[in-house]
Amino acid sequence: MTTPTPTFDAFSPFHLSWMIHRNLIPFPTTLGMISGAEPEEFTEELRKQLQQWSVIDNTNQLTPDAHDLFRGLYEYDFAYWGVLLLHNEKEPFQIEMDQELIDIGIGRSISDTPRVYWQVSYSNSTITVAMRAGDNLTLNTMPADEGNLYESLARAILTVLNPNGIWPAAQFTTVKIPLEVVEKIPTHDASGKKHDKSSVVKTMKYELAKRGVAFDTSSRFVKLINAEKLADTEVLFMPKNKISTSEFFTIEFVHKVGMVLTRTGTDVEGNPVIVQEGATIGAIAEELRKLKAQ
């Protein structure tokens, strides 16, 4: 049987794999697993398309314009990256499992959460935005506003996370909760099974009241816990030619609330707290600035 010639409507991870395995560009680790090698029967079609799109020339080398575009993936002054988890698109599926594992509480059904891998990098007054979702991969550049660099980077990140601008930043007074309370409340039992949300909330209210947290503050925090989280991503910082740092903040997409930024901080006495606020351009920019300043 003859394998049909594949048709790709746009640049894909297969094209990127073709380039990586011919040493045209380094492997971009932030974009998740790229196919170990493009299917052999696709090779010629991929090469032809890359030439048609002026990514490579007749000698199968990067064109000058393509080199300028792709080097933003790996040659930059600094970058931010993350993985957007689309919880609202989670789909359960069945797997074969030994009875011994089932007996200790591990079920046959697990969930596959769709992921969007992204990276936003900066170099020479240019911001490069890369995104991979399944078999779709996009790479774009935009000029940076040097006078408002971190606001430019925040907007670039939101072109991936909130491309149509339909999600507003959450509108509520900033919430600060003692970190020890959040860490103390178990969300799963010893077997890994999730506790009922109502029992977690009840315990949380008790612990917050015991520590003198204002009722309106604890109420706002509990409301956020109860709300449906449709998607979220950690935002991490990556210095030039170094591995990613461990510090991060989170942007969550909460049903009927909006985009929420969650970070760690300290209260007036220097005690660690969890801070939640609306994920405005200004709030995101400030956290990007802090990550780089570490």
Predicted regions and their residues:
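Surface-exposed beta-loop interaction hotspot
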Residues: 128-201
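An exposure/low-complexity boundary signal
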Residues: 7, 24, 44, 175-226
